[in-house]
Protein backbone atom coordinates (compact mmCIF):
# COMPACT_ATOMS: atom_id res chain seq x y z
CA UNK A 1 0.00 0.00 0.00
CA UNK A 2 2.84 2.38 0.82
CA UNK A 3 4.25 1.88 -2.66
CA UNK A 4 0.96 3.03 -4.18
CA UNK A 5 0.85 6.04 -1.89
CA UNK A 6 4.40 6.96 -2.89
CA UNK A 7 3.42 6.61 -6.53
CA UNK A 8 0.46 8.92 -5.96
CA UNK A 9 2.73 11.43 -4.26
CA UNK A 10 4.61 11.84 -7.52
CA UNK A 11 1.41 12.13 -9.58
CA UNK A 12 1.06 15.22 -11.75
CA UNK A 13 -2.25 16.14 -10.09
CA UNK A 14 -1.63 18.42 -7.07
CA UNK A 15 -4.71 17.14 -5.26
CA UNK A 16 -3.59 13.53 -5.58
CA UNK A 17 -0.16 14.57 -4.30
CA UNK A 18 -1.73 16.27 -1.31
CA UNK A 19 -3.91 13.27 -0.43
CA UNK A 20 -0.89 10.98 -0.69
CA UNK A 21 1.18 13.21 1.59
CA UNK A 22 -1.61 13.26 4.16
CA UNK A 23 -1.89 9.48 3.95
CA UNK A 24 1.82 9.10 4.68
CA UNK A 25 1.50 11.52 7.56
CA UNK A 26 -1.35 9.51 9.02
CA UNK A 27 -0.25 5.92 8.37
CA UNK A 28 3.56 5.86 8.38
CA UNK A 29 5.22 4.73 11.61
CA UNK A 30 7.96 7.34 11.22
CA UNK A 31 6.56 9.99 8.86
CA UNK A 32 9.50 12.35 9.39
CA UNK A 33 11.94 9.70 8.16
CA UNK A 34 9.72 8.82 5.21
CA UNK A 35 9.36 12.44 4.13
CA UNK A 36 13.07 13.11 4.60
CA UNK A 37 13.86 10.28 2.18
CA UNK A 38 11.23 11.49 -0.28
CA UNK A 39 12.51 15.06 -0.29
CA UNK A 40 16.01 13.94 -1.26
CA UNK A 41 14.72 13.02 -4.72
CA UNK A 42 11.46 14.98 -4.97
CA UNK A 43 10.81 17.43 -7.78
CA UNK A 44 9.71 20.96 -6.91
CA UNK A 45 5.91 20.37 -7.10
CA UNK A 46 6.18 17.30 -4.88
CA UNK A 47 8.42 19.03 -2.36
CA UNK A 48 6.04 21.99 -2.23
CA UNK A 49 3.11 19.73 -1.38
CA UNK A 50 5.12 17.96 1.32
CA UNK A 51 6.12 21.24 2.95
CA UNK A 52 2.54 22.51 2.76
CA UNK A 53 1.19 19.41 4.49
CA UNK A 54 3.87 19.32 7.17
CA UNK A 55 3.77 23.02 7.99
CA UNK A 56 0.53 22.76 9.97
CA UNK A 57 0.80 19.09 10.91
CA UNK A 58 1.01 17.85 14.46
CA UNK A 59 4.33 16.41 15.46
CA UNK A 60 7.89 17.61 15.18
CA UNK A 61 9.21 18.03 11.65
CA UNK A 62 11.88 20.56 12.59
CA UNK A 63 14.65 18.41 11.11
CA UNK A 64 12.94 18.56 7.72
CA UNK A 65 12.39 22.30 7.84
CA UNK A 66 15.89 22.95 9.16
CA UNK A 67 17.24 21.14 6.11
CA UNK A 68 14.87 23.24 3.98
CA UNK A 69 16.61 26.44 5.12
CA UNK A 70 19.28 25.51 2.59
CA UNK A 71 16.83 25.07 -0.29
CA UNK A 72 17.45 26.87 -3.59
CA UNK A 73 13.96 28.40 -3.45
CA UNK A 74 13.74 31.53 -1.29
CA UNK A 75 10.06 30.90 -0.56
CA UNK A 76 10.91 27.49 0.85
CA UNK A 77 13.72 28.94 2.97
CA UNK A 78 11.43 31.66 4.25
CA UNK A 79 8.71 29.21 5.21
CA UNK A 80 11.20 26.86 6.84
CA UNK A 81 12.52 29.66 9.03
CA UNK A 82 8.96 30.62 9.90
CA UNK A 83 8.23 27.03 10.95
CA UNK A 84 11.28 26.89 13.20
CA UNK A 85 10.45 30.20 14.84
CA UNK A 86 6.85 29.21 15.42
CA UNK A 87 8.00 25.99 17.06
CA UNK A 88 10.49 27.79 19.27
CA UNK A 89 13.43 26.13 17.53
CA UNK A 90 15.06 29.14 15.92
CA UNK A 91 18.34 29.85 17.70
CA UNK A 92 20.11 33.23 17.70
CA UNK A 93 23.12 31.73 15.92
CA UNK A 94 20.75 30.47 13.22
CA UNK A 95 19.41 33.96 12.75
CA UNK A 96 22.89 35.43 12.44
CA UNK A 97 23.73 32.89 9.76
CA UNK A 98 20.51 33.48 7.84
CA UNK A 99 21.10 37.23 7.79
CA UNK A 100 23.50 36.34 4.96
CA UNK A 101 20.67 34.85 2.85
CA UNK A 102 20.66 36.02 -0.76
CA UNK A 103 16.97 36.96 -0.66
CA UNK A 104 16.06 40.26 1.04
CA UNK A 105 12.63 39.03 2.11
CA UNK A 106 14.26 36.15 3.97
CA UNK A 107 16.67 38.55 5.65
CA UNK A 108 13.77 40.79 6.70
CA UNK A 109 11.92 37.78 8.09
CA UNK A 110 14.96 36.84 10.16
CA UNK A 111 15.37 40.39 11.48
CA UNK A 112 11.74 40.45 12.59
CA UNK A 113 12.19 37.16 14.43
CA UNK A 114 15.38 38.32 16.09
CA UNK A 115 13.42 41.34 17.28
CA UNK A 116 10.82 39.13 18.95
CA UNK A 117 13.47 36.84 20.41
CA UNK A 118 15.10 39.87 22.06
CA UNK A 119 18.55 38.31 21.95
CA UNK A 120 21.35 40.87 21.84
CA UNK A 121 24.00 38.43 20.64
CA UNK A 122 22.89 39.11 17.06
CA UNK A 123 23.11 42.89 17.39
CA UNK A 124 26.59 43.10 15.86
CA UNK A 125 25.46 41.38 12.66
CA UNK A 126 22.37 43.58 12.48
CA UNK A 127 24.43 46.74 12.97
CA UNK A 128 26.74 45.74 10.13
CA UNK A 129 23.82 45.13 7.77
CA UNK A 130 22.32 48.52 8.62
CA UNK A 131 25.10 50.13 6.57
CA UNK A 132 25.97 47.41 4.06
CA UNK A 133 22.87 45.46 3.02
CA UNK A 134 21.97 46.11 -0.65
CA UNK A 135 18.23 46.28 0.09
CA UNK A 136 16.92 49.52 1.65
CA UNK A 137 14.04 47.77 3.42
CA UNK A 138 16.53 45.47 5.15
CA UNK A 139 18.67 48.44 6.18
CA UNK A 140 15.58 50.20 7.53
CA UNK A 141 14.52 47.14 9.52
CA UNK A 142 18.02 46.84 10.96
CA UNK A 143 17.92 50.43 12.15
CA UNK A 144 14.55 49.87 13.74
CA UNK A 145 15.92 46.90 15.67
CA UNK A 146 19.01 48.89 16.70
CA UNK A 147 16.75 51.61 18.08
CA UNK A 148 15.23 49.02 20.44
CA UNK A 149 18.28 46.98 21.40
CA UNK A 150 21.14 49.36 20.81
CA UNK A 151 23.10 51.70 23.01
CA UNK A 152 25.02 54.89 22.37
CA UNK A 153 27.90 52.76 21.09
CA UNK A 154 25.84 52.20 17.92
CA UNK A 155 25.49 55.94 17.26
CA UNK A 156 28.39 56.07 14.72
CA UNK A 157 26.54 53.58 12.52
CA UNK A 158 23.36 55.63 12.80
CA UNK A 159 25.22 58.78 11.83
CA UNK A 160 26.58 56.97 8.80
CA UNK A 161 23.04 55.88 7.89
CA UNK A 162 22.07 59.55 7.64
CA UNK A 163 23.93 59.54 4.31
CA UNK A 164 22.04 56.52 2.97
CA UNK A 165 20.67 56.94 -0.59
CA UNK A 166 17.22 55.88 0.65
CA UNK A 167 15.07 58.55 2.30
CA UNK A 168 13.20 56.00 4.42
CA UNK A 169 16.49 54.64 5.76
CA UNK A 170 17.66 58.13 6.65
CA UNK A 171 14.34 58.81 8.37
CA UNK A 172 14.65 55.63 10.42
CA UNK A 173 18.21 56.62 11.34
CA UNK A 174 16.90 59.91 12.77
CA UNK A 175 14.28 58.09 14.82
CA UNK A 176 16.91 55.66 16.12
CA UNK A 177 19.23 58.51 17.07
CA UNK A 178 16.46 60.26 18.97
CA UNK A 179 15.64 57.10 20.89
CA UNK A 180 19.20 56.14 21.80
CA UNK A 181 20.58 59.58 22.62
CA UNK A 182 17.59 61.46 24.00
CA UNK A 183 18.43 64.36 21.70
CA UNK A 184 15.82 65.86 19.37
CA UNK A 185 16.46 68.09 16.38
CA UNK A 186 13.05 67.81 14.79
CA UNK A 187 10.54 65.29 13.48
CA UNK A 188 11.52 63.93 10.04
CA UNK A 189 8.06 62.61 9.16
CA UNK A 190 6.15 65.25 7.25
CA UNK A 191 9.17 67.51 6.98
CA UNK A 192 9.83 69.26 3.68
CA UNK A 193 13.02 68.28 1.83
CA UNK A 194 14.71 71.41 3.12
CA UNK A 195 13.55 70.80 6.69
CA UNK A 196 14.67 67.20 6.52
CA UNK A 197 18.16 68.14 5.37
CA UNK A 198 18.31 70.69 8.20
CA UNK A 199 17.44 67.95 10.71
CA UNK A 200 20.14 65.69 9.27
CA UNK A 201 22.68 68.51 9.35
CA UNK A 202 21.87 69.20 13.01
CA UNK A 203 22.51 65.57 13.89
CA UNK A 204 25.77 65.55 11.97
CA UNK A 205 26.83 68.76 13.66
CA UNK A 206 25.93 67.35 17.06
CA UNK A 207 28.04 64.29 16.34
CA UNK A 208 31.02 66.42 15.38
CA UNK A 209 30.71 68.30 18.66
CA UNK A 210 30.51 65.04 20.59
CA UNK A 211 33.65 63.87 18.83
CA UNK A 212 35.51 67.01 19.80
CA UNK A 213 34.60 66.49 23.45
CA UNK A 214 36.03 62.97 23.62
How does the language model describe each region?
Residues 1-2, 93:
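Repeat-mediated protein-protein interaction surfaces in helical alpha-solenoids
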Residues 7, 15-29, 37, 45-59, ...:
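Structural detector for internal amphipathic alpha-helices that build alpha-solenoid repeat scaffolds
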Residues 166:
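Function-determining sites in protein domains
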Residues 186-214:
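Terminal, low-structured helical/coil segments at or just beyond the last alpha-helical repeat
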